[in-house]
């Protein structure tokens, strides 16, 4: 279960959930407030009317959908609570029937993207030099460096504050003891402050859902402000775009992973960072990777409780990583990692080499069954937090047409980029974890390098000046990458947790099981896209973000081919669900049509 930490200085905000009063804190998201109050099921699925609750808390999974003031399909993790707000369980497809008669709920003006203030639109004087998408370390560094070069820059991000997921909530922390998050979290403050001083226009609360090249060589981005009383959308025109959309947690498709109370470790960390909500008794953490140990340490330091940590790192993986140990030991990750693991092991039960997991329960998680070398055991729990690493969140770049390649070391697809982050699409750079997962320390230098390359391409300075300015960033990147090969080898997710079996859910949105996907493949489906057409896997509101890695793994195993041959979903615009009101708010122009419909005039 979860509990709110004491000494939260924020004022109380009251709203209702299914008619019952709920006390939140100002700044809480709807989803965070509900979880803190013990409400873990927020919607019923359209297909089988099964209860679901938040999985990711970062706007990717759509399992936190609720009805707000009569408006359905609202992501509870992206909307702040307001006094008197009426929140209701979203009850499957029936909720959609009421949408047409419901006025859009209002949100705080500070959340609404002031599109006029960013100077974008169809006017000839509205052309940006660089549009940056994403306000994490890579995006903040890119925007700041580009502004320092004298370029006209705007940054767009879905969150209300800058910082990205890694530094989520850094500008408005509710924690009375900030040290529980660790020094690395607060180091992001310097990036945020530099960005705020840069004068870059910040489109907060903005969803960028289309990116397309134009005939004149510029790029067009469709941007919307979300479900407001008067939806605002615009066509942002830029000479260059830097996609810095970060990473998202890899799906963990084990039996029962869709039960309310089963969440990603990253979701629990976001609850701590943004709402001062911590896991307490009845919590089990399972999986592998640095974030697993980091959150366990943060939770315990904050006063939370972890009943057990089930480590799924396979036997023999440490021996396989040893050839990379020298570089790792010279990195700052070694000492930090040792201290995290030592502290957690001293304060909670750790089970190593777990090779099987299943969440138990009917309408919510009630326990976890796990196996070690064929021996099975179980633990009672009401909260199960899962993590098996992260993958690039590059949906926007993929939909725009950027080439991708399989990274076998990290078991994921990633955009193909040059040493500056330049993609295969002219004028588009991909920076930070959106291009290759290497953590926050590497993200900021990569964002800066992308900005320098874009400035050079736009004629702001020559290649020699670009190279001179890049030297400190190259040095910082080299330091950040030292030891990454050890981490990638040690924590590469085991196939047992990437390839679901039988009736295990592969697609959370459409409730498609692994066996249905396998049946489609054996019936002749040639890959993820045909399997999608036959089963609806990947057709839900998350648009394949959560099941794409799973489909690649299922196709590769079932068809006996490599992941490269299996491929992944073909991404389309809009890359995020948008309302008809947001579409209608776009300017009526050929440029807008081309950006939204991805019209290829050469065909």
Please identify what each model-predicted range represents:
Residues 2-13, 26, 31-50, 59-60, ...:
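Residues forming the flavin
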Residues 54:
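Cys/His-rich Zn2+-binding cysteine-cluster or related metal-binding knuckle/ribbon modules and their
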Residues 21-23:
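N-terminal intrinsically disordered, low-complexity segments enriched in P/E/S/T
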């Amino acid at each position: 279960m979860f509990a709110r930490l004491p000494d939260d200085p924020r004022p109380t905000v009251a709203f209702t959930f299914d008619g019952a009063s709920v006390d939140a804190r100002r700044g809480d998201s709807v989803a965070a407030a509900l979880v803190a109050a013990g409400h873990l099921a927020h919607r019923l699925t359209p297909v089988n009317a099964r209860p679901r609750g938040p999985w990711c808390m970062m706007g990717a999974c759509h399992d936190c959908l609720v009805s707000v003031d009569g408006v359905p399909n609202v992501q509870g993790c992206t909307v702040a609570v307001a006094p008197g707000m009426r929140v209701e369980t979203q009850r499957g497809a029936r909720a959609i029937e009421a949408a047409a008669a419901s006025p859009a709920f209002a949100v705080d003006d500070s959340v609404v993207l002031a599109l006029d203030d960013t100077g974008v639109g169809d006017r000839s004087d509205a052309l940006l030099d660089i549009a940056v998408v994403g306000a994490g370390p890579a995006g903040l560094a890119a925007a700041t460096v580009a502004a320092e070069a004298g370029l006209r820059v705007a940054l767009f991000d879905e969150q209300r504050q800058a910082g990205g997921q890694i530094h989520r909530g850094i500008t408005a922390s509710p924690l009375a003891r900030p040290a529980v998050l660790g020094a690395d979290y607060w180091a992001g403050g310097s990036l945020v402050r530099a960005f705020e001083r840069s004068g870059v226009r910040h489109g907060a609360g903005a969803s960028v859902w289309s990116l397309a090249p134009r005939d004149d060589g510029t790029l067009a981005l469709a941007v919307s402000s979300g479900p407001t009383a008067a939806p605002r959308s615009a066509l942002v025109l830029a000479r260059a775009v830097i996609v810095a959309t970060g990473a998202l947690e890899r799906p963990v498709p084990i039996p029962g992973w869709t039960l309310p109370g089963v969440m990603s470790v990253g979701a629990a960390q976001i609850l701590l960072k943004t709402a001062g909500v911590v896991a307490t008794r009845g919590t089990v953490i399972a999986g592998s990777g640095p974030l697993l140990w980091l959150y366990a340490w943060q939770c315990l330091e904050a006063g939370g409780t972890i009943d057990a940590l089930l480590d799924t790192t396979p036997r023999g993986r440490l021996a396989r990583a040893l050839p990379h140990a020298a570089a790792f030991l010279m990195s700052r990750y070694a000492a930090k990692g040792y201290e995290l693991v030592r502290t957690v092991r001293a304060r909670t039960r750790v089970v190593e080499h777990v090779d099987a997991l299943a969440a138990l329960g009917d309408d919510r998680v009630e326990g976890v069954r796990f196996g070690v070398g064929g021996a099975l055991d179980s633990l009672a729990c009401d909260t199960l937090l899962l993590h098996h690493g992260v993958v690039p969140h590059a949906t926007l770049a993929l939909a725009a047409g950027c080439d991708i390649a399989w990274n076998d070391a990290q078991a994921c697809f990633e955009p193909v980029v040059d040493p500056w982050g330049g993609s295969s699409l002219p004028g588009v750079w991909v920076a930070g974890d959106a291009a290759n997962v290497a953590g926050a320390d590497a993200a900021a230098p990569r964002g800066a390098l992308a900005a320098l390359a874009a400035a050079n391409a736009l004629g702001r300075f020559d290649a020699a000046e670009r190279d001179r300015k890049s030297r400190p960033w190259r040095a910082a990147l080299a330091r950040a990458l030292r030891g990454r090969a050890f981490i990638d080898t040690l924590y590469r997710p085991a196939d047992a947790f990437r390839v679901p079996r039988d009736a295990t859910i592969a697609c959370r949105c459409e409730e498609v099981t692994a066996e249905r996907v396998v049946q489609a493949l054996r019936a002749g489906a040639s890959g993820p896209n045909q399997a999608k057409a036959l089963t609806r896997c990947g057709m839900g509101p998350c648009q394949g973000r959560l099941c794409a890695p799973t489909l690649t793994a299922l196709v590769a195993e079932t068809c006996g081919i490599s992941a490269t041959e299996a491929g992944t979903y073909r991404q389309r615009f809009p890359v995020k669900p948008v309302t008809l009101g947001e579409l209608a708010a776009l300017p009526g122009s050929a440029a807008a049509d081309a950006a939204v419909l991805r019209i290829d005039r050469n065909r």
